[in-house]
């Protein structure tokens, strides 16, 4: 069976039919008759194409040339077929319409690669979006659970406080819950009650003073907060969290040398502290600059 994407177009003229090749989505199908003939389907019409031998005999008869028998022509099929194939390829390569049609039928690997690349980008964006949604959902659920836990804890502790059976530790826990819920006045109240009722270890009491100092600083009551932090480090000198909070409060109050001293105290107990080290290094430069400005002003006076 012969299969091809080529269609023959017959051009009428005074000369014998000339067959020109155009690329199209038709097929050359073998005829049901003699094997020397091929039927060609063109736009719903079937055209019989003569074999090479019949075509040569017709040309000789039309031009009045000496007759040749088929036996002598059997020596020429290879040369004739090669010649016709060369002529067909020459016409295909020379005709611009044929070249354009050939370009249409050629596969386009660049287009396919670009399409795959675009699809991969879309999938990447989709996966990224799903990941962000998943992370956001996780944090939202976590916050809801934490808030619910705090609410339950606060409710239970408040019931004990109302009954008058709350211990100093329970008052401290209730004050810490209020601090986390950002109810600072309530946190101050319960933490102060815990300090007054405290009868345990002084080092544990330092945590109560530190929590009360944090509550005051968040209300922008820096002096009261600093006083609580200083009490905490007095009760527990190695309490690095209270030292960091004290340094932060001093820096907010623009007392840079005292803030620098607090962060240096942290590094004495914890040399690799990730909070105190960068703060200390930044404050060193600021303190040097501040001292230089003060020295210049004193000289001018």
Curated annotation (Swiss-Prot):
Coiled-coil blocks: none
Location in or out of the cell: Plastid, Chloroplast thylakoid membrane
UniProt keyword Ribonucleoprotein, yes or no: no
Gene induction: Induced by light.
Chain ranges passing through the membrane: 82-102, 121-141
TPR repeat locations: 168-201, 206-239, 240-273
Keyword annotations from UniProtKB, A to Z: Chloroplast, Membrane, Plastid, Repeat, Thylakoid, TPR repeat, Transit peptide, Transmembrane, Transmembrane helix
Record-linked InterPro entries: TPR-like_helical_dom_sf, TPR_rpt
PROSITE patterns named in the record: TPR, TPR_REGION
Changes seen on gene knockout: Seedling lethality when homozygous. Dwarf and pale yellowish phenotype when grown on MS medium supplemented with 2% sucrose.
Membrane topology value: Multi-pass membrane protein
GO BP terms: photosystem I assembly
Main location: plastid
Transit peptide: 1-61
Example of a GO cellular component annotation carried by this entry: nucleus
Primary role: Nuclear genome-encoded factor required for the accumulation of photosystem I (PSI). Functions as a PSI biogenesis factor. Cooperates with PSA3 to promote the stable assembly of PSI in the thylakoid membrane. May target primarily the PsaC subunit.
Subunit structure, as described in the record: Interacts with PSA3.
Protein name: Tetratricopeptide repeat domain-containing protein PYG7, chloroplastic
Highest classification ranks of the organism: Eukaryota, Viridiplantae, Streptophyta, Embryophyta, Tracheophyta
């Amino acid at each position: 069976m012969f299969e091809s994407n080529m269609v023959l177009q017959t051009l009428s003229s005074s000369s014998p039919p000339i067959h020109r090749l155009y690329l199209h989505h038709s097929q050359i199908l073998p005829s049901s008759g003699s094997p020397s003939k091929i039927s060609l389907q063109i736009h719903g019409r079937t055209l019989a194409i003569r074999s090479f031998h019949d075509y040569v005999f017709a040309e000789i008869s039309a031009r009045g040339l000496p007759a040749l028998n088929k036996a002598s022509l059997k020596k020429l099929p290879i040369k004739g077929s090669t010649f016709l194939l060369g002529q067909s390829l020459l016409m295909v390569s020379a005709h611009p319409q044929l070249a354009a049609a050939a370009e249409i039928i050629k596969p386009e690997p660049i287009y396919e690669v670009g399409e795959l690349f675009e699809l991969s980008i879309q999938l990447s964006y989709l996966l990224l979006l799903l990941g962000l949604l998943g992370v956001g959902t996780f944090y939202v659920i976590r916050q809801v659970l934490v808030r619910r836990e705090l609410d339950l804890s606060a409710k239970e502790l408040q019931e004990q406080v109302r009954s008058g059976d709350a211990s100093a530790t329970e008052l401290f826990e209730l004050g810490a819950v209020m601090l986390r819920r950002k109810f600072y006045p309530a946190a101050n109240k319960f933490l102060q009650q815990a300090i007054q009722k405290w009868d345990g270890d002084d080092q544990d009491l330092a945590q109560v003073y530190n929590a009360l100092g944090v509550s005051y600083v968040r209300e922008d009551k820096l002096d009261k907060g600093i006083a609580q932090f200083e009490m905490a480090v007095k009760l527990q000198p190695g309490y690095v969290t209270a030292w960091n909070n004290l340094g932060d409060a001093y820096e907010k109050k623009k007392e840079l040398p005292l803030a620098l001293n607090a962060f240096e105290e942290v590094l004495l107990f914890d040399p690799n502290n990730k909070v105190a080290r960068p703060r200390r290094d930044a404050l060193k430069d600021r303190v040097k600059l501040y001292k230089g400005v003060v020295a210049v002003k004193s000289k001018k006076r």
